[in-house]
Structures are given as C-alpha cells and as structure tokens.
C-alpha cells in the first residue's frame, strides 16, 4: 500500500466550549451513548442470549474480547479524526491516504453490509411491535404491516429538526428501560452461578449444542459485537456535536466510556438471564419464540412484553440513525473514490444522498418482513455476523497504519509501541474471526437445514 501525497493543514478552530464541571461533562455526553445504542441492535441481544442459552457461560470470554476490541477500535477511529495533521474529520479520508483504492473497496462492501444490517433492524422492530400489539395484522402479513409503520415513523423523523437530539434522548430512555427490564428478570431468576461466570472468562470451546456450532457462536459474537462497521459512524456523531480538533480528545474518551458501560451491562444481563434459565434445562434458543418462552418462564406473563419492548427499542434506536450513518459512509467512499469532491463540498450535498437513504436503506429492507423470510435469530446469527466480518480485516489494517504513522498524526500523537501491539492483536483477532466465520458458514447452514 502506498500513501498519497500529503500536505499538512491548520486544524480549524471551533467555537464550542469544553465543559468545566462534572455536570457539564455529563450533559455533553451523547455520541458514545447514541453509538452504543446504535450498536445494541438485535445483533448484540440475539448473539448474547443465544450464546448464554445454548452454552451457558462457556463462551463469555468472546463477549469480553468483543467489547474491549470495539472500545479500542472506536477510540482509535476517533483519535485519527481529532488528531490527524491534515484536518480530516472524515475517517474515509484517512483510509484514502493509506491506499487510494480503500474508498471504492469500502464503499462496495459497506453498501452490502448496510442492507443486511438494516434488514435485521427492521425485522426486529417489526416483530417487537407485532408481538406487543397482540399479533395485530395476522400471522402471515402482521410483521410486514408493522414494518411499514416503522418505516413511516423513520421517514417522519427525517423531516423534523434536531434529529440527533431526538436520537440522543431515545438512546438514554432505551438504555434505562433495557437495563431495568433485564435486571428485574435477573432478580426473578433468584440465583447466579458466580463460579461458572468466572470460569467463562477463560478461553475454551465447549461441545456443540443447539442449532448453532460453538465456534460459530464464538466468532459471530466477536464479529457482531466487536467488529461492526457501525464503528465508523462515531466521527459523524462527533461532528454533529461540533467536536472537531484535538482539544476534544479527553471529552471524547469519557463520552465513549459513558456509552460503552451500559452496553457492557446490558450484554452481560442478556447473557446471564439466558445462561441461568435456559442452559442446562434441555432447551435451546433457535428463534424468537424461544426468546419469548425464556422470558415467560422467568417473569411470567409480563416477560414477553419486556422482551419485545427491549427488542423494539434496540432496533429502533438503530434503524433511523444507521440509515443515515451508513449512507453517509457509502457516499463518503464514492465522494473520495472519484472526483465528486470537486462538485460537492460534502458527500451529504449530493442530491442522490437522500434518495438512496430512503429507497435502499429505509424502504427496501421491508422485503425481509414478507412471508417466508428468515426469522429474527437466523438473520442475526448468520446474516449480520457474516456480512460484518468481511469488512473487519481491511478496516483494522488501515486503522493500524493511519494512526501509527508519524506523517499522518499531529506531533507526539502517533501510536506508541504498546498501542501498535494492541491494535496488532485486535487485527489478528479480527482476521481469525473472519476466517472462522467463512470457513464454518456453509457447514453451519447445512447443519441447520
């Protein structure tokens, strides 16, 4: 790979004032939580619950690896956008400086991944509403009709002001409801296998159980939770808050921590409830009906309602924001791959931006809610994990190169040796998980069929 010719520029100054009090910092937080709730779509919920139900705590180490990898990965993405010497506030610009072909390469991959991910979010949200409203619409077309409702609400949000503020508020509410719901479920369980929990933090693969292989659950958890292409959306959320330039690095790190903590708690709660209730009972989780049965056995008649509320909130905090975020990434790739930057100041100025966002990433995903489409669990375990894993290795390698080169970063801000080693290990884990997902994909499909 060869870098393009570089020219250092002055970082533009931004008038947004940094907070000076604890209350000020807390009120400033938002991008990290919005991003975390964007991540915390059904991929996390389903991956953690299926792993806990089918394998107990034996694969808990994959969750730790996934969340640590994600946290560091996002942090270094933010580091480049805040502390590069060129004034780039678009991560795609950095990838282009590593290799001219990256924007087009990423654009093609992300376009495919985004559609699969949006389909999983829309189906999850529609299933949640369908179940919450007593299966209104019938078994055949009910989920499809509720998907139209979600699409309509999303389109309405697009024409309202302060979209980001609405998403930030919804993310805060959703995180509280989800933590509260599964904490209540955990209290109702009444027991916790602490020794099993601690043992699950050590590496190892158990015997296969349920419809999904242990190795496939392990790598899909790492891929779906740790290596999501949604990691690339964080700079866009920072720009929406006006965080441009190195002075926001400390605030950004605290914000990311603020967002990742509830994500960790929610994932552990999903996992623990499933491990304590389903694992060892002779049952497994293969579809959304099994998820509902699990919550019924724990909480009683209110259990499924809590589950469907969580599933709806997890998907709906993701579907609108990722339609814009993914589309922005794709157009940024197209923008920097050719000469469109000579015609439009930003990728969002392209008149095709809104058209593609609406047609491809809001309306087209409706097809996954039609009769005969894959169920919620199958779509997330097989579809989302495979799609996201394909982007992970080049994403990590490019990030390693751009943040480690002194010619790319402000003086003293290039990765030190320990940071290079850390990113190198994360990159190797990403490459391994991609290899294992691809290697086991067809074997897993044949096993299910």
Predicted regions: what they are:
Residues 176-208, 215-235, 395-408, 433-445:
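Hydrophobic alpha-helical segments and their helix-loop junctions in multi-pass secondary transporters
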Residues 35, 62-96, 105-119, 321:
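Juxtamembrane transmembrane-helix boundary signature
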Residues 158-189, 385-391, 415-420, 425-428:
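Membrane-interface loop-to-helix entry segments
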Residues 127, 131-136, 151-174, 185-186, ...:
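Membrane-water interface regions at transmembrane-helix termini and the short interhelical loops
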């Amino acid at each position: 790979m060869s870098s393009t010719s570089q020219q250092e520029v002055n970082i533009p100054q931004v008038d947004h004032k940094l907070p000076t009090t604890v209350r000020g910092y807390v009120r400033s937080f938002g991008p990290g939580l919005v991003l975390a709730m964007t991540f915390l779509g059904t991929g996390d919920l389903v991956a953690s619950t299926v792993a806990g139900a089918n394998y107990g705590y034996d694969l808990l180490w994959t969750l730790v690896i996934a969340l640590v990898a994600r946290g560091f990965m996002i942090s270094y993405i933010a580091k480049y956008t805040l502390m590069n010497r060129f004034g780039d506030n678009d991560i795609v610009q950095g990838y282009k400086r590593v290799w001219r072909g990256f924007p087009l390469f990423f654009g093609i991959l992300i376009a495919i991944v985004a559609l699969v991910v949006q389909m999983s979010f829309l189906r999850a949200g529609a299933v949640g509403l369908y179940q919450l409203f007593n299966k209104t619409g019938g078994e055949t077309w009910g989920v499809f009709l509720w998907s139209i409702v979600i699409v309509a609400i999303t389109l309405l949000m697009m024409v309202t002001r302060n979209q980001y503020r609405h998403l930030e508020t919804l993310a805060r509410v959703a995180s509280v409801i989800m933590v509260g719901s599964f904490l209540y479920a955990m209290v109702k369980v009444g027991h916790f296998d602490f020794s099993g929990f601690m043992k699950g933090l050590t590496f190892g693969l158990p015997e296969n159980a349920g419809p999904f292989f242990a190795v496939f659950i392990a790598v899909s958890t790492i891929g779906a939770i740790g290596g999501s292409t949604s990691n690339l959306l964080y700079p866009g959320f920072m720009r929406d808050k006006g965080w441009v330039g190195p002075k926001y690095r400390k605030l950004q790190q605290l914000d990311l921590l603020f967002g990742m903590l509830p994500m960790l708690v929610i994932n552990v709660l999903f996992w623990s409830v499933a491990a304590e209730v389903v694992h060892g009972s002779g049952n497994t989780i293969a579809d959304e009906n099994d998820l509902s049965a699990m919550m019924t056995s724990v909480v009683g008649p209110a259990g499924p309602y809590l589950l469907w509320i969580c599933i709806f909130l997890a998907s709906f905090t993701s579907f609108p924001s990722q339609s814009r975020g993914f589309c922005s990434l794709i157009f940024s790739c197209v923008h920097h791959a050719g000469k469109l930057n000579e015609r439009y100041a930003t990728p969002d100025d392209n008149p095709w931006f809104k058209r593609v966002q609406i047609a491809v990433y809001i309306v087209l995903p409706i097809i996954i809610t039609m009769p005969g489409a894959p169920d919620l669990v199958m779509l997330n375990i097989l579809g989302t994990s495979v799609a996201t894993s394909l982007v992970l290795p080049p994403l990590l390698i490019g990030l390693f190169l751009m943040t480690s080169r002194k010619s790319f970063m402000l003086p003293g801000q290039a990765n030190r040796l320990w940071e290079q080693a850390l990113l190198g290990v994360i990159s190797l884990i990403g490459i391994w998980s991609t290899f294992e997902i691809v290697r086991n994909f067809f074997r897993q499909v044949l096993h299910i069929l």
